[in-house]
Amino acid sequence: MTDRPTFVYVTFIQATPEQVWHALTDADVTAEYWAEHCNISDWQVGSAWEHLRTDGSGIADLVGTVLEAVPPKRLVITRTGPNDERPAGPGRVTFDIEPHGDIVRLTVTHENLSDDAEYVLVSAGWPSVLANLKTFLETGRVLPQGPWEMYAEMRAARMAFNDPK
C-alpha cells in the first residue's frame, strides 16, 4: 500500500471503443483536443511515447513508456517530465475503455503521483482534456474555449486574492 495520491476520472462518451482508442493513440487526433500537444508513439508494449508540442519546436513536455496496449480496451503508460528525477519512479496512467450499448465508459487512473501538488495539477488537467476529447468525439469539434484556461484564470484570481500587497 502506498501513501502516494492517485487520481481517478470516469466519463461516458457516445462513441465506439475503437473510436476512443483511435482518439487516444492517433497523433493527429490527439493534436485536435490536447491543447497544443500531440501524443506520439507506435503504442507497442515497451515503446516510448512523447507528449510533443505542436508548434514545431520538437519539445516533449512529457515522456514515458507503453506498459500495456490492448486495443480497444486498455492502454497503460508511464508519464513523467523528460528531466524529472522521481525517486519513486514515474507516474502511471491507465485508460480503461468499456463499451455499453452505444456509449463507452472511459476510466483514467493516474497513479504514483509525486505529491499533493501534482494531484492538484492532474485534477485540473485530466477533466479538461477528457471534456475536450468527449466533445470532439461526439460533435467533431473541440470546446470553443480550452477548459484548462478556466483553471489558469481561477488560479490567477486566487493568487491575486491571497497577495498581501
Model regions: which residues?
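Conserved catalytic core of Hanks-type protein kinase domains
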Residues: 23-24, 69
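Short beta-edge strand/loop motif at the mouth of beta-sheet-based domains
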Residues: 8-9, 15, 19, 28-63, ...
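A short, structured loop/turn motif at beta-sheet edges
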Residues: 17-18, 67-73, 96-105
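Hydrophobic/aromatic beta-strand elements that line small-molecule binding cavities or substrate pockets
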Residues: 11, 62-68, 91-98
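Hydrophobic pocket/interface hotspot
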Residues: 20-21, 30, 49, 66, ...
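A conserved amphipathic terminal alpha-helix motif
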Residues: 112-165
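Beta-strand/loop substructures that line and gate deep hydrophobic ligand-binding cavities in soluble
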Residues: 82-128, 133-135
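Vicinal oxygen chelate
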Residues: 58-62, 80-87
